[in-house]
Amino acid sequence: MANPTGNQPVSYPIFTVRWLAVHTLAVPTVFFIGAIAAMQFIQR
């Protein structure tokens, strides 16, 4: 992350592959945690 030329990201696209990898893992994880937490409060 130490870039001597300034704050221009030169060699890596920040939000293409990394953004997709984080969100394809994070979005279903948050959804299932919310669904499991909601199921704890459902009485039969």
Swiss-Prot record:
TM region positions: 19-35
CC annotations in GO: photosystem II reaction center; plasma membrane-derived thylakoid membrane
Alphabetized UniProt keyword annotations: Electron transport, Heme, Iron, Membrane, Metal-binding, Photosynthesis, Photosystem II, Thylakoid, Transmembrane, Transmembrane helix, Transport
List of residues binding heme: 23
Membrane topology designation: Single-pass membrane protein
GO molecular function, one term: heme binding
GO annotation, biological process: photosynthetic electron transport chain
Cofactor binding summary note: With its partner (PsbE) binds heme. PSII binds additional chlorophylls, carotenoids and specific lipids.
Pfam family, one: Cytochrom_B559
UniProt KW Transport keyword: yes
Keyword Amino-acid biosynthesis assigned: no
Assembly information from the UniProt record: Heterodimer of an alpha subunit and a beta subunit. PSII is composed of 1 copy each of membrane proteins PsbA, PsbB, PsbC, PsbD, PsbE, PsbF, PsbH, PsbI, PsbJ, PsbK, PsbL, PsbM, PsbT, PsbX, PsbY, PsbZ, Psb30/Ycf12, peripheral proteins PsbO, CyanoQ (PsbQ), PsbU, PsbV and a large number of cofactors. It forms dimeric complexes.
Designated name of the protein: Cytochrome b559 subunit beta
Protein source organism: Gloeothece citriformis (strain PCC 7424)
Phylogenetic classification of the source organism: Bacteria, Bacillati, Cyanobacteriota, Cyanophyceae, Oscillatoriophycideae
Gene: psbF
